[in-house]
UniProtKB/Swiss-Prot annotation:
Boundaries of every TRAM domain copy: 397-467
GO function term, MF aspect, one: 4 iron, 4 sulfur cluster binding
EC annotation from Swiss-Prot or TrEMBL: 2.8.4.3
Region entry Disordered, spans: 477-510
GO CC terms, sorted: cytosol
Protein name from the UniProt record: tRNA-2-methylthio-N(6)-dimethylallyladenosine synthase
Organism (species): Mycolicibacterium vanbaalenii (strain DSM 7251 / JCM 13017 / BCRC 16820 / KCTC 9966 / NRRL B-24157 / PYR-1) (Mycobacterium vanbaalenii)
Length: 510
């Protein structure tokens, strides 16, 4: 573990209950969920979440290291806080997450006004590090080299009353040449199925309707259990999906991300046969060129990928399939790029997260010859975007006239106030902006509505025909009351002492 670094930091500690915090999150769903844990830790230590638009006494950056612009964004935001830190020495700044794990030796050099640097393996140390930095007037840098405590054993202050992330594993055993995540998050460690289901049950007991199972590679779940007494089980993920289907009150189950190399038919069968598993699949492709996939060490080829898509659609005809794509991987030729366009055209993705290759120091791909010129990458990227936008619009236009069930959400529609619409997600994950009509004041985030699609755009659907059904839910009650679920149910790694009691359920029956 990296030890303390001497650096002038904050002054004596004011009363914790009077101090506020803000967590700023960059990156993937794993980071979003980790930020919920960071918030839970700080609230458990006596700090209060800062109000909207207020200057917080403690600002925590939970960082991403996947792309170069994440570095630039972090240090730009840190520089914006420097004048405030200078005028208010009691303010504290903490940097955690993947970028902190990677840049442990340089964060303070680039931003010496930072008080705490912590990594991906020791997020539970944040309150103690803040106290130590404030008491000793010494900035704290503490980076663990291996997981100290399974993160889900930590308290989590959830962002939503109706939808929740549930980690089934941390880390990754794959060796994709473009990805730095395994080096920063470590080897895969899986939670026991019973512990995952206990957390899901706790969330449902508090009114949550939708959970998303999280892992870097959910298809590998079951081969690296944290508990050495738990037998390896390559069919564990399909069994976990089916077990979620037996939890009364859990209406929607999603998962991310699977890996094409290990995606098996038992998972497809579980998806098709478990009613609350949503008809959606996010399956990263990255490239349609077998030559580039080999250079990426992706362990599958385009034919296998397309075969999975065909089998999913045969079992779940209306499944919405999304993907990740990288343009401009080192050595990519026009022929390779055309192969990607061909697979995208054949796959008919409802949407895609498309990225220009970003060279990351510490990854094998960064050392490869034939780095593609930026102008070439940009031109190819635009062609891919144009193709996928056309496909997305065609796929969404095909939804017009269909009846959809929506879980009403908050923060999904930037123009909702101007258009008098609300927003929600269909069971297949599509974003729908809908007109609530005369009952609009009665519809709350967390409620469930049924409406008919009347219009389409590449990234969303419109439903202006009014509501067919509106069901008030406990999640909607909780949102209206400003209540959010909390978890921290002991999970998958040995712990000391008895777990805290589960929170009492609130709200009326659904």
């Amino acid at each position: 573990m990296t030890s303390t670094v001497t650096q002038q930091a904050s002054g004596p500690s004011p009363d914790r209950s009077a101090r506020t915090f803000e967590v700023r999150t960059y990156g993937c769903q794993m980071n979003v969920h980790d930020s919920e844990r960071l918030a839970g830790l700080l609230e458990g230590a006596g700090y209060r979440r800062a109000g909207e638009g207020a200057d917080a006494d403690i600002v925590v950056f939970n960082t991403c290291a996947v792309r170069e612009n994440a570095d630039n964004k972090l240090y730009g935001n840190l520089s914006h806080l420097a004048p405030r830190k200078q005028s208010d020495p009691d303010m504290q700044i903490a940097v955690g997450g993947c970028l902190a794990q990677k840049d442990r030796d340089s964060v303070l050099r680039k931003a010496p006004w930072v008080d705490v640097v912590f990594g991906t393996h020791n997020i539970g140390s944040l309150p103690a590090l803040l106290d130590r930095a404030r008491h000793n007037r010494v900035a704290q840098v503490e980076i663990a080299e291996a997981l100290q405590e399974f993160p889900s054993a930590l308290p989590a202050s959830r962002e939503s009353s109706y939808a929740a992330w549930v980690s089934i594993s941390v880390g990754c055993n794959n060796t994709c040449t473009f990805c730095i995540v395994p080096a920063l998050r470590g080897r895969e460690v899986d939670r026991r199925p019973g512990d995952v289901l206990a957390e899901v049950q706790s969330l449902v007991d508090q009114g949550v309707l939708e959970i998303t199972l999280l892992g870097q590679n959910v298809n590998a779940y079951g081969v690296s259990f944290a508990d050495p007494t738990e037998p390896r089980d390559r069919g564990a993920f399909a069994k976990l999906l089916r077990a979620c289907g037996r939890i009364d009150g859990l209406e929607r189950v999603r998962f991310t991300s699977p890996h094409p190399a290990e995606f098996t038919d038992d998972v497809i069968e579980a998806m098709a046969e478990t009613p609350n598993v949503c008809p959606t699949l996010h399956m990263p492709l990255q490239s349609g060129s077998d030559r580039i996939l080999r250079a990426m060490r992706r362990s599958y080829r385009a034919e296998r990928y397309l075969g999975i898509i065909d089998r999913v659609r045969a079992a779940i005809p209306h499944a919405a399939i999304t993907t990740d794509l990288i343009v401009g991987f080192p050595g990519e030729t026009e022929e390779d790029f055309q192969a990607t366009l061909d697979v995208v055209a054949a796959s008919r993705f409802s949407s895609a997260f498309t990225f220009q290759y970003s060279k990351r120091p510490g990854t094998p791909a960064a050392e490869l010859a034939d780095q593609v010129p930026k102008a070439v990458v940009s031109e190819r990227y635009q062609r891919l975007i144009e193709l996928q936008e056309r496909i997305s619009l065609e796929e969404n236009t095909a939804q017009i006239g269909r009846r959809v069930e929506l879980l009403v959400a908050t923060g999904e529609g930037r123009k909702d106030a101007a258009t008098a619409r609300m927003s929600g997600r269909a069971r297949d994950g599509r974003l729908v902006h809908f007109a609530p009509g005369a009952v609009g004041s009665e519809v709350r985030p967390g409620d469930v509505v049924v409406t008919t699609v009347t219009g389409a755009a590449p990234h969303h659907l419109i439903a202006d025909a009014g509501l067919i059904e509106h069901r008030r839910t406990r999640a909607g009650d909780a949102h209206a009351a400003g209540q959010k679920p909390r978890t921290g149910v002991g999970l998958g790694m040995p712990a000391v002492g008895a777990p805290d009691p589960l929170p009492a359920t609130t709200g009326c029956a659904r």
